[in-house]
Regions:
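An N-terminally biased module of ancient metal coordination in phosphate/nucleic-acid-related enzymes
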Residues: 1-82
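Short active-site-adjacent structural elements
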Residues: 184-188, 214-220, 247
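Non-catalytic positions within long, well-ordered alpha-helices that form the structural scaffold/packing
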Residues: 42, 142, 199-200
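Mid-to-C-terminal alpha-helical segments outside catalytic/metal-binding sites
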Residues: 221, 225-265
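Extended substrate/RNA-proximal surfaces in nucleic-acid metabolism proteins
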Residues: 62-177, 258-265
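Catalytic metal-binding/acid-base residues of hydrolase active sites
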Residues: 19, 55, 92-93, 126, ...
Length: 265
């Protein structure tokens, strides 16, 4: 049974960025830990998550790697009686636009929900690897009718120091994913200030946990509560409505594409 929900909180929250699959990347190392995280999510009011293991230079997980893990974990959730739906996805790092485009066109990436609607895009932690043509890359993705969601820019020192790098990405159509732990100050004051400022000045944002385990996860309800307290209930509701729109879109697409089970074959 879910925990009581705070005012304004929905019982159908979706987390679009989390590392919940056991033994796949730098998330939980055991099935028990993943199930513990799943129970935490359910108690938090989350019903759907997109599992987003890393796809970067050292952990380069593609849809053929990810889909079987998602299928297997959904079976474990069902067996454990945990009412959480896990959809496929990945956190795809773009440090070389040409390489990104090549893999995108080869259809090897696992976008959110394994669909062609939303994709979670991360930039390198190193400014030297931030592509000079990142705006063109965002436009290129948008031309393919997909919405890139840029993962946690508030945690990247170069976006904080040079916000002029981020604004053109937003202008080109990217949405921005803010991590709840940033708002709560768990990644330091600079990330917190940047995240708050962004949410005050931009509508195109999504809250996500970027959970890696039960210790590195504050859930989503704490994030929406923080926004309600500091930015008002209207802003919090707007963020919830946007996430709900994504949830409905991804769930609707699950019915139109082959099942995760059959795709994992
Ligand atoms: Fe992540």
């Amino acid at each position: 049974m879910n925990a009581p929900l705070a005012a304004g909180q929905t019982s159908r929250m979706i987390d679009l960025h989390c590392h919940i699959l056991p033994g796949v990347d730098d998330g939980p190392t055991s099935l028990n830990e993943s199930l513990k995280l799943a129970r935490f999510f359910v108690a938090d009011g989350i019903t759907v998550v997109t599992a987003t293991p890393h796809c970067h230079s050292s952990i380069h997980l593609l849809r053929s790697d990810i889909l079987p893990h998602v299928s297997a974990f959904n079976r474990e959730l069902k067996a454990a009686g945990i009412p959480l739906i896990v959809l496929p996805g990945s956190e795809i790092q773009a440090f070389n636009s040409a390489a990104y485009r090549r893999e995108f066109e080869a259809d090897v990436f696992c976008h959110l929900g394994d669909s062609r609607t939303f994709t979670l895009l991360e930039f390198s932690w190193s400014e030297e690897l931030f592509p000079a043509d990142s705006v063109e890359l965002i436009k290129w993705i948008r031309e393919r009718n997909m919405r890139p969601i840029v993962a946690h820019p508030e945690r990247h020192h170069y976006f904080r120091q040079r916000p002029e790098l981020l604004q053109p990405l937003v202008d080109a159509g990217a949405w921005i994913q803010i991590t709840v732990d940033s708002l709560l100050g768990n990644f330091g004051p600079e990330a917190k200030v940047f995240a708050e400022r962004f949410l005050r000045t931009h509508r195109d944002a999504i809250l996500a946990s970027d959970a890696h385990n039960t210790k590195r996860c504050s859930g989503l309800s704490a994030g929406y509560a923080w926004v309600t307290e500091h930015l008002g209930s209207e802003r919090s509701q707007d963020l919830l409505d946007r996430a709900e729109m994504v949830r409905m879109s991804l769930m609707a697409e699950q019915a139109t594409i082959p099942t995760i089970q059959s795709k994992a074959g």
